[in-house]
Amino acid sequence: MHTGGNGAKHLYAALEGSLRRLRTDYLDLFWVHVWDSVTPAEELLETMVAMVRAGKIRYWGMSNAPAWYVAKLATLASVRGVPGPIALQYFYSLVNRDLEDEHLPLAKEFGMGVVPWSPLAYGLLTGKYDRSVVEAAGPRAGGFAA
């Protein structure tokens, strides 16, 4: 996981930190987690391609980014003949199926895999928690916005 945005400096720092902690030379899959609303798609693509070509990562994916931004990345990668995102990671459960509107068609169109996070809706679907308790907790505490 990285903090500080999607610019090259922050992504490389996150990558090197992960490699060090995992005591490995490369990652099979590097997630760009959360779009920063600032970094142009072209810049992010260049950074990710450089990481792949350097042998630091084999593949990369996007988590919690707008569908239009991921589509732009995938299109640029296709046109340029460079490695684009191969997977998407988003909140997806029986409680919230918003992913089906834009992101699943995007994944299908560009041949990307989809990895859901919190498929049990922060535990709500286990039956262990009451919906009002989960909603009241808010997203930071493991709840969700209704």
Residue ranges and their predicted role:
Residues 6-22, 43-46, 68-75:
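Short, acidic/polar
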Residues 19-40:
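Active-site groove signature of glycoside hydrolases
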Residues 1-12, 33-39:
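Active-site mouth loops of central-metabolism enzymes
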Residues 1, 30, 144-146:
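A short, mixed-charge helix-start or loop-turn motif at secondary-structure junctions
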